[in-house]
Amino acid sequence: MKTIRAQMAVLGFLLPLVLSAAAGPDFGQTVRNFSANRHKLIQELAARLNLPLPPEAEAFFQAALAGDWTAVSNQLAQMQAQDPCQARQPALMNELWAPIHETWGLYEVWAGLKEDSELMAKFTEPILDSMPAGSIYFGGTDAGRFAVTAVNDLQTPPPAFCLTQNGLADNTYMAYLREIYGKRIWLPAPEDSNAAFKQYVDDVKEGRIPTGADVEIEDG
C-alpha cells in the first residue's frame, strides 16, 4: 500500500508539470513583453525626434506592462480620437502614436480570443514559419496585424518586416515606418505617397473604381 501511495503521489506531482508543458507558452506573457518592447520603442522615438511624451502615454504603458486590461482601456480613452486608429492629442499625432496603437491592438486581439494561448500560437506560428527571413508582411486584419507583429518583433532579430496596408495612406504611419525600418526596406518618399493617394482619389471621383474595391465618399 505504501508503494502504491508513493507512486500515486509522484504521479500527482508530475501530472501538472506534464499538462503545463503540453499547454505551450503563455501568450499573456507575450502581450506584456510586447508592451515592454513598444514602451522602449516609443521612448527611443521621442528622444530621437525630440518629441515630448505625454504623461498619459507613460501611464498607458505602465498599465500594459502590469497586464491591467481595464486600466489599459481607460488610459487609451484619454488619448484616442473617435477614429480608433488616430490620436486625439496633438502631441501624439506623429510617429509616437503607432507604438501605442500596436500595443492596444494586441490587447484587443488577446481579449477577443478569450486569452487562449494555444489558439494564438496556432494562428501566428504558421504565418511566420511560412515566410523566409527578410520577407515583408502585410497584416490587414487586427489579428493578422497585431498578433503576428508581436510574435515577430519579439524575436532576435525579427525575421520579417511587419506593416499594414491599411495605414499606407496615413503620413504619420509612413513616417513611423521610415523611422523603424530606415533604409533596410524601400518605402516611398512622402511626396510619392501623397501623389499616389491623390491619384487614387481622383480615379474614384471620375468613376474609375477598381473591381472589388469598397469605397465610401463622405462630405464630397
Show which residues each predicted segment covers:
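Bacterial N-terminal signal peptides that target proteins for export
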Residues: 1-11
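Bacterial N-terminal signal peptides
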Residues: 9-20
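ER/secretory pathway lumenal C-terminal domains and tails of membrane proteins involved
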Residues: 20-220
